[in-house]
Amino acid sequence: MPLRPGRCYRHFSGPAYTRKEYIPGVPQPKITKFTMGDHKKDYDFEVRLLTKQIGQIRHNALEAARVIALKQMTSMVGNETDFYLYVTKYPHHVIRENKMMAFAGADRLQDGMRLSFGKPIGTAARITKLGDLIMAIRVKKEHLEFAKKAFKVASSKLPLDTEIVVVPLKEEKTQ
């Protein structure tokens, strides 16, 4: 069965479903790397991707946003040693789906809404407060516009509205 659209899982109600020791067959999250680049360098700015809505972000949307941000930064900056990109959200919540059959005679084969708990199909990160940090890039001053552009493209991969905030890491010298 194909993957349902992300809008089916964008909003949530009820407590998080995270106890993996009780859930058989939870698929692994697609996002595996959470830090990329050189974290030891001295950077001037941190560009943050913050949420403007409350909801859920599926693991494949997080991975797509991470990949496109990394690809944009490496193509514009040149190499991975001139910035530090990190993802702060982890997809803990297990998403379930009650699969329904849609063909002639399906009503004889399935139970409908009886025992409709569903089977695990993926994981999602829950955003519970406005302004939550999803990911951030630390850059030098000359790469600041590249980081903003990379996050603009990456935000199109996420199901929630986001905003890009620039935070200076060093004090500006006034002379």
UniProtKB/Swiss-Prot annotation:
Tell me yes or no: is Ribonucleoprotein among this UniProt entry's keywords: yes
Q: Which SUPFAM superfamilies match?
A: Ribosomal protein L16p/L10e
Q: Which GO terms describe its cellular component?
A: ribonucleoprotein complex; ribosome
Q: Which InterPro entries match?
A: Ribosomal_uL16 (IPR047873), Ribosomal_uL16_arc (IPR022981), Ribosomal_uL16_CS_euk_arc (IPR018255), Ribosomal_uL16_dom (IPR016180), Ribosomal_uL16_euk_arch (IPR001197), Ribosomal_uL16_sf (IPR036920)
Give one Pfam family.
Answer: Ribosomal_L16
Question: Which CDD domains does the record associate with it?
Answer: Ribosomal_L16_L10e
Which terms are listed as keywords in the entry? Ribonucleoprotein, Ribosomal protein
Does the entry feature the keyword Cell wall biogenesis/degradation, yes or no? Answer: no
One of the GO biological process terms: translation
Recall the GO molecular function terms of this protein's record.
structural constituent of ribosome
Q: Which Gene3D superfamilies match?
A: Ribosomal protein L10e/L16
What PANTHER family does this protein map onto?
Answer: 60S RIBOSOMAL PROTEIN L10
Q: Which family does it belong to?
A: Belongs to the universal ribosomal protein uL16 family.
This protein's name: Large ribosomal subunit protein uL16
Source species of the chain: Metallosphaera sedula (strain ATCC 51363 / DSM 5348 / JCM 9185 / NBRC 15509 / TH2)
